[in-house]
């Protein structure tokens, strides 16, 4: 009997089947994983698209509702958003500068001078603070330039010294007692470096009474101790200004004015004795004073329903000297004009021997409402002369031919009907030869 042994053959067959199964199983696993990944990716993309579409839909719905409620176009929302972003950035910049700027300035002050900028501190070495350092350097440069300018101005400013005086007003007697006590640190006006100072006193605006101290030879610190009395009523003293004019005496030429001190008596307490020092100010510029013609104050009022234009000449000040004695006899001439033709002319009273006349005189002109924009008003300050012709000092031109402050005054009057509008004006030159002279009053 023959026995057949199939064990080894079966084992070999099993091994072959196992190998084939393993070879077939590997591709199956790879295919499955790839499919799973593809499904996951597709799902994510689909979900992302859905979410984005939903967000866009919600945004569109909100935008439409807001636009319907506010009535604003789309570009307006874009503009407002841009402005909001700019405001946020500006606030952030200011906050950062406020927080860190103080710290830098504090450190600079502690270290002193320029050391805080160019020392070995961490704020300079750290690259993050380079921009802040550059900004501080720029500010420092500007501050240094400003300091240099101020120092240059201080060097150019000449010290004229100061003067000590005493004021005492007697209300019962109506008199002002002025004592010139002393002066010190006066500038040297002579070749030797000294001066021969004296003080001239008078009251503005009249300059009628002038008094002088004695001359003190070759000194920059004179002691005067001289007293003078001015008769001034109490109802007039508040409009006066006391002048201390300091001069250097010269025997053979014109005396040079060192400087002056002005005391407005309306701004001090006359009920008490005043004794104080005052710095001496530079003297007035004679050339500029000669060019100035003065100022005039008047009010304008127009009533459209009545067609009535009212001009009130109030006062004038600092008028140009026209007479030999250094004064003038001023009056004011008002001329209503249209198309170069004079419609009506009126004049104030004459104020004798003054450069600061007070009038408070009213004049009326009939001007219909349809003509008010076509007329001009020429206000001229004249100097009365008893023997010769009256000369013009200066004038203002208002109305349709006016310019600058005169035109603004006229427009303010028209914008405020029935209400008087008062204003000061600087007198301009009278260019027309025919207006420089006037007939007798």
UniProtKB/Swiss-Prot annotation:
Residue span(s) of domain C2: 159-278, 292-425
Residue intervals on the Cytoplasmic side: 97-441
Topology in the lipid bilayer: Single-pass membrane protein
Keywords: Calcium, Cytoplasmic vesicle, Membrane, Metal-binding, Necrosis, Repeat, Synapse, Transmembrane, Transmembrane helix
Vesicular side: 1-69
Binding site for Ca(2+) 1: 190, 196, 248-250
Protein name as catalogued: Synaptotagmin-1
């Amino acid at each position: 009997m023959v026995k057949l042994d199939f064990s080894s053959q079966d084992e070999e067959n099993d091994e072959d089947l196992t190998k084939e199964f393993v070879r077939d199983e590997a591709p199956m696993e790879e295919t499955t994983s790839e499919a799973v990944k593809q499904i996951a990716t597709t799902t994510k993309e689909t979900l992302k698209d859905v979410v984005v579409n939903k967000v866009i839909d919600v945004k569109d719905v909100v935008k439409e509702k807001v636009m319907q409620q506010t009535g604003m176009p789309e570009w307006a929302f874009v503009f407002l958003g841009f402005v909001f972003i700019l405001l946020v950035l500006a606030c952030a910049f200011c906050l950062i500068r406020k927080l860190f700027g103080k710290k830098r300035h504090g450190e600079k002050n502690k270290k002193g001078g320029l050391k805080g900028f160019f020392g070995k501190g961490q704020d300079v070495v750290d690259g993050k603070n380079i921009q802040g350092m550059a900004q501080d350097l720029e500010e420092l440069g500007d501050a240094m330039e400003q300091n240099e300018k101020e120092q240059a101005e201080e060097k150019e400013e000449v010290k004229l010294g100061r003067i000590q005086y005493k004021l005492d007003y007697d209300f019962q007697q109506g008199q002002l007692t002025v004592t010139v006590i002393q002066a010190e640190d006066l500038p040297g006006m002579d070749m030797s470096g000294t001066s021969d100072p004296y003080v001239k006193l008078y009251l503005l605006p009249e300059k009628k009474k002038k008094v002088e101290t004695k001359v003190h030879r070759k000194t920059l610190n004179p002691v005067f101790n001289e007293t003078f009395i001015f008769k001034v009523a109490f109802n007039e003293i508040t409009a006066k200004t006391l002048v201390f004019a300091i001069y250097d005496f010269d025997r053979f030429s014109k005396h040079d004015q060192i400087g002056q001190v002005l005391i407005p008596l309306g701004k001090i307490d006359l009920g008490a004795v005043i004794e104080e020092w005052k710095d001496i100010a530079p003297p007035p510029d004679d050339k500029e004073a000669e060019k100035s013609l003065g100022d005039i104050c008047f009010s304008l009022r127009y009533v459209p329903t009545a067609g009535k234009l009212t001009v009130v000449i109030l006062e004038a000040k600092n008028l140009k000297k026209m007479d030999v004695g250094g004064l003038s006899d001023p009056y004011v001439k008002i001329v209503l004009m249209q198309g170069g033709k004079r419609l009506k002319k009126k004049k104030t009273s004459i104020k004798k021997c003054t450069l600061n006349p007070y009038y408070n005189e009213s004049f009326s002109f009939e001007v219909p409402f349809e003509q008010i924009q076509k007329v001009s008003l020429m206000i001229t300050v004249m100097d009365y002369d008893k023997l010769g012709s009256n000369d013009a000092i200066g004038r203002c031109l208002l109305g349709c031919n006016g310019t600058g402050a005169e035109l603004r005054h006229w427009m303010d009057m028209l914008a405020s009907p029935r209400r008087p509008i008062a204003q000061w004006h600087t007198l301009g030159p009278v260019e027309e030869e025919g207006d420089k002279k006037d007939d007798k009053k």
